[in-house]
Amino acid sequence: MTTAPFVSPSLPRLHSARASPFPKPSVGSGGGVAFPARTYGSSLRLRSAVMSASGVGGNGSPMAPEESTVSSRLGEVKRVTKETNVHVKINLDGTGVANSSTGIPFLDHMLDQLASHGLFDVYVKATGDTHIDDHHSNEDIALAIGTALLQALGDRKGINRFGHFTAPLDEAAVEVILDLSGRPHLSCGLSIPTERVGTYDTQLVEHFFQSLVNTSGMTLHIRQLAGNNSHHIIEATFKAFARALRQATEYDLRRQGTIPSSKGVLSRS
């Protein structure tokens, strides 16, 4: 008896990626939901897991990841004055790579937290008049990071906009709430018990965030819930800020690429 050859059924075709910033997903073989690739200028190849509604494949195990193409949101700033020379690069869609050399060891450690917990790629190279004190370098680095963040965010289409995270570190706990609104405001409720951590003047923590807020145009609230160790309090602050910023900069697929504002615009002007 002759057996007819098996012909694999054709898979449904994906909708065109040009239809909208967030095209309607299609259902692939095995029930997986697949989002078509979308390219914005230069692109970065990332691995994204394609899951069924239950989060597993038909055999009860996670489905194999598929590749999608998304853009990298990048910002780069060079700030040169008679006091400092600062170069900052940030990738909001990074993997948590930190490369910081500021001349202020404790600040380098805090920028590592920003990269690691925000999953941002952060490059900061700075020289300055640290023979006087760390004030000018601390300020100008924060100003440059804020400006790079502003560049990377662009028109802010499709982002969550708001972020909220509380980070503990041993006895310390710090809550951060932020809004990428375009309106700069800082409320900082830290009570750091010592004047220095290593050689770093702890007054500069609030000044760092004020400078970053001024150029990025974010609303930022920092509240210390607990803590009596200065290092722990400051590090918990940077960790909470990183996670809140990560939440705010991530995309909300339900927004379909629209600006998250009833006014239809989020900007400094």
Curated annotation (Swiss-Prot):
SUPFAM superfamilies, A to Z: Ribosomal protein S5 domain 2-like
Residues binding Mn(2+) 2: 135, 139, 207, 232
InterPro entries for this protein: IGPD_sf, ImidazoleglycerolP_deHydtase, ImidazoleglycerP_deHydtase_CS, Ribosomal_Su5_D2-typ_SF
Location of region: Disordered: 1-31, 54-73
Main subcellular location of this protein, as a coarse class: plastid
Family: Belongs to the imidazoleglycerol-phosphate dehydratase family.
Name of protein: Imidazoleglycerol-phosphate dehydratase 1, chloroplastic
Organism lineage: Eukaryota, Viridiplantae, Streptophyta, Embryophyta, Tracheophyta
